[in-house]
Amino acid sequence: MYDFKREGFPGFPLGQKIEFYERKLPGSRMVVTDLPGTDRSIRTLHSRLALEGSEHSSIACQLGEGDLVSLIEISGADGDKLSFEGLPLAGLSAEELVAQLRERGIAAEVGSVTVELPKLNISFFFFEDVPRTIAWQTSEAF
């Protein structure tokens, strides 16, 4: 079982530049999108990440210097082998995940398709009431 931690993307602590991810993720693809009417752009790094023998889609997005968002797809065939801070994610609805997190002393809120951990800057995205993606973001990101 792979256990995700609050400190960030596995093996990629928050606060790193997107180039750090690019060097460590073989076969990654960078996409740069200019934001109309501004002098800013979003850099998005798409890659596959192996976690204990299974591959997961991963994305790192950077807007500006210090604002990084990292996402990992957690659904799929091996979704029953993933956990967050020791809490198995398989079979948990958004409401059940919030209840379990709160029992562990982690502040959590249910959104329309998310479970937000505002003090940790972590979000779980749900589709059909199944956790599909986990995202970590630096506090500057949003």
Annotate each language-model stretch with its function:
Residues 1-142:
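Short helix/turn-capping signatures at newly exposed starts of structured segments
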